[in-house]
Amino acid sequence: MALACTPDEGVENNGNKNNNYGGGYRPTGKITVKGLVYGGGSTKLAGVVISDGLLCVQTDENGYFEIDSDLSRTKFITASIPSGYSAPTDENGLPIFYHKVTDEERTKDMVQHTFEFLPINNNPNRYTLIVGADPQPRARSAGYDNIAYHSLDMCEDFYRDMREKAATITDRNVYGMMLGDVVHENMSLYTDYLAGLKTLGFPMFNILGNHDND
């Protein structure tokens, strides 16, 4: 299933001694996560929401943030993508707006990370969002049943349709969102899913589905 829609139009505190945040949760315990958010070059972004999955803070006027996070429970540190900016992508077209907490960081009880976003040169409010769901690739030898996109062959058709649709849109940015079940209870096929995303030519945001977690 796929559809497309378009709207109408090393880290230091940087002098933030008073925790003068733009809003959100104020840390009261030991600081275990801190960093900066940049928006192209040396521009530091204020008011960007940063979360450890439980607590949320906003960057101050210097783009600085800190969280008193329980790193024994925290898996990722994420940043909201501020208006007027886009997230950089990896080689597969996955947007990078998060940091995975490492075992070394847990041992040290400290995460220091810098997020960097890219200014959007054209109208950031004019874009097309291509939404898909349930690619659920399975081995080519799995055969077919009543479930759509049962095999990798069907997934390739799915990716081709999205790629061809995106190619017709030249006057605005294109983004994708996959609404879960990117694989069918077989994470060994995740690399095949990524190979499909790599052909799309636009960034794909992904949401966890039950078959991805079972």
Predicted segments — roles?
Residues 21-46, 71:
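Structural motif
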Residues 83-84, 187-214:
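Extended active-site neighborhood of metal-dependent phosphoesterases/phosphodiesterases
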Residues 54-70:
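Short, acidic Ser/Thr/Gly-rich low-complexity loop/linker segments typical of extracellular
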Residues 25-26, 98, 102-189:
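N-terminal active-site segment of His-dependent metallophosphoesterases
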Residues 2-32:
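Bacterial Sec-dependent N-terminal signal peptides
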Residues 52, 72-103:
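A short, solvent-exposed loop/turn motif at the edges and junctions
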